[in-house]
Amino acid sequence: MSAISIGQAVVLGAVEGVTEFLPVSSTGHLKIVEGLMGIPVDDDAVIGFSAVIQVGAIAAVLVYFSKDIMRIVSAWGRGLRDREERYHHDYRFAWWVIYATIPIVLVGLAAKPLIKGPLASLWVVAGSLIVGSGVMWWADRTGRHKRGEDDTSFKDAMLVGGSQILALLFPGFSRSGATMSTALMLDLDRVAATRLSFFLGIPALTGAGLYELKDALGTGAGAAPLAVGTLVSFVVAYASIAWLLKFVAKHTFNSFVVYRIAVGVLLFGLLGTGVLHS
């Protein structure tokens, strides 16, 4: 069992908070930082710690979008009681989110041995970072960016939600990267693509976080580091979400494309030189 210090918990919480919702792969970043700090990345306590602090980032997106979430849930509840309310976009969108989550749940359960086994390799993470960069570049370049959030359809939700499977099977692809790229291919504007990515990710991230939490708490990572890391993750993730929405309103995704390639190359280098082990 590996003890994680308070200082290391702060660093890892910050890394998780920054990268969980940016299209850059939180998994790859956490593994790199853990390796550089001399923390054994395959230790049960470390794996458990990473799973728990993710809950802080999930809480951040729930708080940040709380008004939107309450509006959508309220519309859904009204629609269940009143047929006239079922024509409201928020009511339909609530069902779309539910339906769009089903594919990733089914694949996650069916492919769990692969996901926890060979597909968890850092070589896969590094390769997925670079391949995902190419997909993101192409999507941002060819997408027409003409459709807003109110123009989203059931088809959009299913395709974007289903694309989360890419990140599940190839973790370096990044859940945010996969969903945002898919939304851009569907001609959504960058802000709409980003917000849709957040909304469709909430059920999957929350479910996965709670599922991992029950096992992670028993790994012996330490209560104080867990609390600190989770709190830091929450604060940093909240700021990261706010920054990302402002950034994509004025910029392309090219900065993320270049950065992802650099991180992928760095990860290949660390693996090749033995600094990190897959």
Curated annotation (Swiss-Prot):
PANTHER family: UNDECAPRENYL-DIPHOSPHATASE
Lineage: Bacteria, Bacillati, Actinomycetota, Actinomycetes, Kitasatosporales
Gene Ontology CC annotation, any one: plasma membrane
Function noted in UniProt: Catalyzes the dephosphorylation of undecaprenyl diphosphate (UPP). Confers resistance to bacitracin.
GO MF term (any one): undecaprenyl-diphosphatase activity
Record's keyword terms, sorted: Antibiotic resistance, Cell membrane, Cell shape, Cell wall biogenesis/degradation, Hydrolase, Membrane, Peptidoglycan synthesis, Transmembrane, Transmembrane helix
Catalyzed reaction equations: di-trans,octa-cis-undecaprenyl diphosphate + H2O = di-trans,octa-cis-undecaprenyl phosphate + phosphate + H(+)
Family, as annotated: Belongs to the UppP family.
Name of the molecule in the record: Undecaprenyl-diphosphatase 1
Native source organism of the sequence: Streptomyces coelicolor (strain ATCC BAA-471 / A3(2) / M145)
Alphabetical GO biological process terms: cell wall organization; peptidoglycan biosynthetic process; peptidoglycan metabolic process; regulation of cell shape; response to antibiotic
Compartment list: Cell membrane
Location (main, coarse): membrane
Membrane topology listed for this record: Multi-pass membrane protein
TM region(s), chain numbering: 45-65, 95-115, 119-139, 191-211, 225-245, 256-276
UniProt xrefs under InterPro entries: UppP
Other information: Bacitracin is thought to be involved in the inhibition of peptidoglycan synthesis by sequestering undecaprenyl diphosphate, thereby reducing the pool of lipid carrier available.
EC id: 3.6.1.27
Name of the encoding gene: uppP1
Domain of life: Bacteria
